[in-house]
Amino acid sequence: MRCPKCNYHKSSVVDSRQAEDGNTIRRRRECEQCHTRFTTFERVEELPLLVIKKDGTREQFSRDKILNGVVQSAQKRPVSSTDIENVISRIEQEVRTTYENEVSSTAIGNLVMDELAELDEITYVRFASVYKSFKDVDEIEELLQQITNRVRGKKKRLNNDETN
């Protein structure tokens, strides 16, 4: 690893530890010539994953595109950036482990919706309203009814667990 200060090609690792995300190794290095210390990060190189869009075109998978959509949907909601980052990480991991080279944008959208349904209902509805491109109010009402039924089911299970 070249030193960022003097560009010398040899450095030694002073400290090595796993970064917070669990997928990266953080290394502190010291240049063997000028003794400058610097940090490097090491991560597994992942093969490109292509997303097949609804119109049939293909583009490279972008974690940032998913992140931007979720962040917009979660604006002014009690959803922390850590929660959002965890959701995005789970989605990316699921996509990369389930699909080898290509994944449909529909599959990604469904994964996002599943995650958001568990995270925050309003964020879920906001994302769904853009993702699903609702044509009329009836479609939105149907989605809200599904959410209401799911919430009632959860409350019912919780009440049953408390009484047992």
UniProtKB/Swiss-Prot annotation:
Disulfide bonds: none annotated. Residues 49-139 form the ATP-cone domain. A zinc finger (unnamed) spans 3-34. It comes from the Bacteria. GO terms for biological process: negative regulation of DNA-templated transcription. One of its GO terms (molecular function) is zinc ion binding. Binds 1 zinc ion. InterPro entries: ATP-cone_dom (IPR005144), NrdR-like_N (IPR055173), RNR_NrdR-like (IPR003796). The keyword RNA-binding does not apply. Keywords: ATP-binding, DNA-binding, Metal-binding, Nucleotide-binding, Repressor, Transcription, Transcription regulation, Zinc, Zinc-finger. The keyword Transcription regulation applies. Its cofactor is Zn(2+). Negatively regulates transcription of bacterial ribonucleotide reductase nrd genes and operons by binding to NrdR-boxes. PANTHER family: TRANSCRIPTIONAL REPRESSOR NRDR. Belongs to the NrdR family. This is Transcriptional repressor NrdR. It comes from Streptococcus pyogenes serotype M1.
